[in-house]
Amino acid sequence: MKSWTSRPVPELPGSMPQLRLYDTALGRVVDVERQPEQSMYVCGITPYDATHMGHAASYVAFDLLNRAWRDAGVRVSYVQNVTDIDDPLLERATATGVDWRELAQSQIDLFQTDMDALNVLAPNHYIGAVEAIPDIVPAIEQLIADGVAYRVAGSEGEPDGDVYYDVETAGKRSDATDAWTLGDVSGLGEKEMLELFAERGGDPTRAGKRHALDPLLWRVARDGEPSWPGSTLGDGRPGWHIECTVIAQKYLPAPFTVQGGGSDLVFPHHEMGAGHAYSLSGVPLARHYSHAGMVGLDGEKMSKSKGNLVLVSKLRAAGEEPAAIRLAILAHHYRSDWSWTDAEFAEAKDRLKQWRAALDHAPAGSAAALISAMRDELANDLNAPGAIAAVDHWAAEAIRSGSDKSEQDTALVTDAIDALLGVEL
């Protein structure tokens, strides 16, 4: 699947110091190992309501990581999927009377346009779940052959043959120190897992499962649902978690550096994906797990069901500048839960004007200290609010000085804010 095209990233003198990142699985901030190439997988959208502010905040967060690595002079291999076949997509297509393929493509196109507008660097590989099915089928067959997946008999009108992952058996297969067991990524207890599993697409009460938390690997064909050839699995379509695992294992090293996504993906999605990966390869999926906070609206949870989604495309259609939208997102630390408000968006627009005005008075020799301060903040768990505060201080001092601008420093500050924060002045 074709991705959008990234804009060029300015090169700056010097480089990013040692990057430290909060690792969800470890529960603390850790050094991200220095190496000549870093790799990242960020879970993509299910294309039926793009791009709301929660989506935007998550992809902007990991765009900061991408930019920090690039500023450190390393190559970055970045993969993102798109879940272009899933129950919510099919349900929305049925409700609106639109073919699911047309709905998915229209929302993918809109998402990519929004990402380009927000200056989010494009992934090296942008892979749809549907195009990955030929790779997913043999992976599931391997899990069955290895005894960590099983078929479930039909009941209550459901057909025979759905395939599930056996979390208990999989977790006992190896006593290696890096082997996966249930809870390694999320750190949750079984009670919390069961609640979240039911809320986030799982089926804990499905008859015939060995364990309530066993996730679906392959859903055999049903009347009225799209399906694909599954070889020995029979026609059907893949479960959500196995899609990302197989895509990541095909396009990234094992283990890759960072698995990213919203905090609502910690469990079950990233937990189960880690299990699938270890069962398939005997190697952890990722070295680090990083998650962005949730975004609400005026203090309320933002959700499709509540009809209170703030869409990037609607803001753009209303004439709002994407750089201001991005700056409003960056005013919050990526791990924090926060709410989008008109007042804070107004602050972001005012900040953007202030920064641009300050460029007319950029003091000679001021850029180097600003760039160093921005780098120090971003190297500390992607502290964008700290980097913004550094620019605010520089801008206030520049305007206060009233000096004639230094062309060199104006160019350096403009490039730094673009390269490190992704905000174009």
UniProtKB/Swiss-Prot annotation:
It catalyses: 1D-myo-inositol 2-amino-2-deoxy-alpha-D-glucopyranoside + L-cysteine + ATP = 1D-myo-inositol 2-(L-cysteinylamino)-2-deoxy-alpha-D-glucopyranoside + AMP + diphosphate + H(+). L-cysteinyl-5'-AMP binds at C43, G44, I45, T46, S58, N81, V82, T83, W240, G262, S263, D264, V295. HAMAP family: MshC. One of its GO terms (cellular component) is cytosol. This is L-cysteine:1D-myo-inositol 2-amino-2-deoxy-alpha-D-glucopyranoside ligase. It comes from Paenarthrobacter aurescens (strain TC1). Catalyzes the ATP-dependent condensation of GlcN-Ins and L-cysteine to form L-Cys-GlcN-Ins. A motif ('HIGH' region) lies at residues 45-55. Belongs to the class-I aminoacyl-tRNA synthetase family. MshC subfamily. Its EC number is 6.3.1.13. The gene is mshC. Its cofactor is Zn(2+). A motif ('KMSKS' region) lies at residues 301-305. Monomer.
